Amino acid sequence: LTTLYATPFGDAYFMACTHTRKLLEKLNAARLGMDEAAPYINTGVLLYNLPALRADLDMERVRAFADEKQDVFLLPDQDILTALYGDRVHLLDSMVYNLSDRILALHNAELRNAPVDLDWVRAHTVIIHYCGRLKPWKPHYVGVLDVFYHELMEEIQK
C-alpha cells in the first residue's frame, strides 16, 4: 500500500478505480443527467484528497443533487461521486488496487489482453475487493479469488 499512499493526487479530489466500460459510462451519464460521460467510480477503494475537499467541497450541491436524482440512483455513493466529481478522480488500475472476480473474468475474456492467473494476482495485485453478494466467507461463493481469503484465515488461526 506504500506505493498507493505515495501516489500524488494532482488536482484530483479522489483516487479510485472504475469497474465499468465505455458503454456503461454513457448510460450512467444519461441516467445521472451528466453533460459528459465520466468513468463510473467504484467506491470500494477510495482515497480522499482531504485538503482539496475541505477547501472546495460544496455540501449543498451534494444534497441538492441527491434530492433531485434520488429516484434514479442505483448505487447512491457511486452515482453522486461519479456525477459531481467524476472529472476530479485520479483513476487507479483496477487489476492492482481493486480486483474482483468480475474484473478478472472480464480482463481474461478480452482477446487483446494477456491472460492473468492467480500467480500474476499474487505478484501484482495489492487489494482484492469481494464486492457484490457473493463473499468467500459465505456458502456458494463463485470465483477464484477466494483462495486469498482462505489463506489469510489460515494464517490468522495459527
Functional labels for PLM-detected ranges:
Residues 1-24, 45-48, 55, 81:
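GT-A fold catalytic core of metal-dependent nucleotide-sugar glycosyltransferases
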Residues 1-4, 25-30, 56-61, 140:
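A short secondary-structure junction signal
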Residues 10-34, 139-145:
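A short, conserved beta-to-alpha structural element at the edge of catalytic cores
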Residues 38, 42-158:
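A glycosyltransferase accessory/donor-loop signature
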